[in-house]
Amino acid sequence: MGKYFGTDGVRGEANVELTPEMAFKLGRFGGYVLSQHELETPKVYVGRDTRISGQMLASSLISGLLSVGIEVYDLGVIATPGVAYLVKKDGASAGVMISASHNPALDNGIKFFGGDGYKLEDEKELEIEALIDAKEDTLPRPSAQGLGMLHDYIEGVRKYQAFLKTTAEGDFEGYNVVLDTANGASYTSARAVFADLKANLTVIGENPDGLNINVKVGSTHPEAMAKKVVETGSDLGLAFDGDADRLIAVDENGEIVDGDKIMFIVGKYLLEQGKLAQDTLVTTVMSNLGFHLALEEAGINSVITAVGDRYVVEEMKKNNYNFGGEQSGHMIFLDYNTTGDGQLSAIQLLKVMRETGKTLSELASEVTIYPQKLVNVRVKDNAAKKSAMDVPAIQKVISEMETSMNGKGRILVRPSGTEPLLRVMAEAPTHEQVDHVVDTIVEVVEEEIGVK
């Protein structure tokens, strides 16, 4: 991570940390870095989610892009993976998504995709940061015909919808589905896609007002969807987050099916079809012990990375794997798209149900999840977050708790990549054990570096 770029672009409270001035600089300098080797006039796609600050930041970012001679195509409200898909398909120079994903409405973020549809490499981000921090802006300032132009690209969403539908390889007629679009980016696509695939739909979280994105809806709050699934007697529920790069499901009984279980279900099906590259699934350190045991039982190899879908994708690209993801619901199908895609993941999950004839609860029952607890501790600042593991008292309590578990469980303490939070997670055979371990560590963290 750099000074401005975290694990998922530049994030902060909109108009306080992530200001219009910063958005302009990111557009100007980011656009320059990503297009300086173009032989023709560079073309950049810009999308956003439904946050009230999105239009403000988009106008500033676009101004920066135009100032260095870039042709900008405004996609409007669209899912993050839609930007990545269209950039690669249309041969654009780069793409930019304005979103803070699952974060609340007061936050926003800006992330870049290269012309290949993948998130930027660290080297490119550092190059952009160096230009932002330079004492003087020495980039070209073209005038008249050298300036870029802004184009509305409303058909981009329709192209993305058409792509999603092709991945179903059939339809979902007869399935009753609850969709939760989190009052976010997928409200422009999810209903249309699944209706065209002939599913019977009930949709919640489909009325964004700029402030209600992720509020008691979406993949981080699936309770409302679970209730609706039971009320309507639906076969399953599918919840996306604010920018629709995640999926969390709910079975016909209202039980949550997280990213680990979805990855197992789809991974096992791909293995049986001979379509799981090298019989391997890529996941992160956050995935549950029970998930790994189920993979082993099914004959699936696993490769573990640091937390963050960018690290999963890097591993997949490096070793030619085609499927991976995170417990949080990011799932990457490199045979279809370059980044996590909630709607694509939902289609693949429904496809497994259709092809096997099994209910979601039957498919998910093959994974026995160990009790897990995760607590986010708000710390003083980002410096405290990064140095937390150097604090003797924190080191000591983690060591003591690991000893107390006798090898039957695990502890993971790590800084958030996007917020001043320290994440404390543990897994153990019983809920009592996991509560004791996490609560004990959290108490020490709060005492040492927490916000008083």
UniProtKB/Swiss-Prot annotation:
Pfam families: PGM_PMM_I, PGM_PMM_II, PGM_PMM_III, PGM_PMM_IV
Catalysed conversion reaction: alpha-D-glucosamine 1-phosphate = D-glucosamine 6-phosphate
Maturation and modification: Activated by phosphorylation.
Catalytic-site annotation from UniProt: 101
Source superkingdom: Bacteria
Record InterPro entries: A-D-PHexomutase_a/b/a-I, A-D-PHexomutase_a/b/a-I/II/III, A-D-PHexomutase_a/b/a-II, A-D-PHexomutase_a/b/a-III, A-D-PHexomutase_C, A-D-PHexomutase_C_sf, A-D-PHexomutase_CS, Alpha-D-phosphohexomutase_SF
Positions that bind Mg(2+): 101, 241, 243, 245
Molecular function as annotated in GO: magnesium ion binding; phosphoglucosamine mutase activity; phosphomannomutase activity
Enzyme Commission identifier(s): 5.4.2.10
Phosphoserine: residues carrying this PTM: 101
Cellular component annotations (GO), alphabetically ordered: cytosol
Gene3D superfamilies (UniProt xref): Alpha-D-Glucose-1,6-Bisphosphate, subunit A, domain 3, Alpha-D-phosphohexomutase, C-terminal domain
Keywords, ordered alphabetically: Isomerase, Magnesium, Metal-binding, Phosphoprotein
Biological process (GO), any one: carbohydrate metabolic process
Presence of keyword Transport: no
Top EC class for this record: isomerase
UniProt remark on cofactor binding: Binds 1 Mg(2+) ion per subunit.
Cofactor: Mg(2+)
Matches recorded under HAMAP family: GlmM_B (MF_01554_B)
Role, per record: Catalyzes the conversion of glucosamine-6-phosphate to glucosamine-1-phosphate.
UniProt record similarity statement: Belongs to the phosphohexose mutase family.
Protein's UniProt name: Phosphoglucosamine mutase
